[in-house]
Amino acid sequence: IHEANAKPGLANRLGGTFAKFTGVAFPNTPFPRATLVGMPMKDEIAYLNREAHRSKARRNLGLDPQKPTVIVTGGSLGALSLNNAVAACRDHFAEWDFQILHITGKGKAVLDENGELLSAPNYRQIEFSNGMQDVYAAADLLLVRSGAATVSEVAAVGVPAIFVPLPIGNGEQALNARSLVEASAALLVKDAEVTGEWFAREIPALMANPEELERMGAAAYELGIRDAARVMAEAVLKAAEK
């Protein structure tokens, strides 16, 4: 069994009683007899050299390859609070010395008051990206949900991030981010606090402090686990032999 979330689901809790091997993605997962293995991910992400890939990644995403970049994404389904917060800052975009890539989610394009695709200087929106390695390489700062895969990939590649846990469910997204947040390797903000005012205040302030971004990224990288796919594959093969 592999438990992805820091708060195990019922099926895995029951199955873990009989499993020959249980791997968990996060160190704070309350699972008896579990082994910390991390989250299996593609090698393109696990072993990504962000600095070497940065300029190409930004070009792939339609961005200025030389400009500092904030990327906002709620995943493939989007996140209404993140989308609304970004849209509310439209009048500020031209003032900032960084660009924003806004990944809105499939079918969640952000429109202006005329029903046209929201457009502004230093701003680009797309509905989704098939290459998350480009997203991680291009970003100087991520504003994202804290699903298990996202948190694990953020740590593996060492990208500074602000996590906004999904406000519904059983609280697993906040728990997923806990180890990074407690290590000062990432920030966590409640969904209800993410407004246009918050974005306009906090994002430019953090982007103006590249030393802090570098420190966050390095701290995240130290906590990253990059060989989970291999470890889980070996565990499955070993269990099958018994």
Residue ranges and their predicted role:
Residues 225-242:
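C-terminal alpha-helical cap of glycosyltransferases
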Residues 1-55, 60:
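Active-site-proximal region of nucleotide-activated glycan assembly enzymes
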Residues 205, 212-226:
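A short, well-ordered alpha-helix in the C-terminal region of glycosyltransferases
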Residues 184, 189-190, 194-211:
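C-terminal "capping" alpha-helix adjacent to the active site of nucleotide-linked donor transferases
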Residues 53-59, 63-144, 174-178, 189-199:
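Donor-nucleotide binding loops and adjacent catalytic segments primarily
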Residues 133, 151-159, 178:
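Short alpha-helical segment that forms part of, or immediately flanks, the ligand-binding pocket
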Residues 137-139, 155-164, 183:
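Conserved donor-binding/catalytic loop of nucleotide-activated donor transferases
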Residues 144, 160-170:
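Short hydrophobic beta-strand element within catalytic cores of glycosyltransferases
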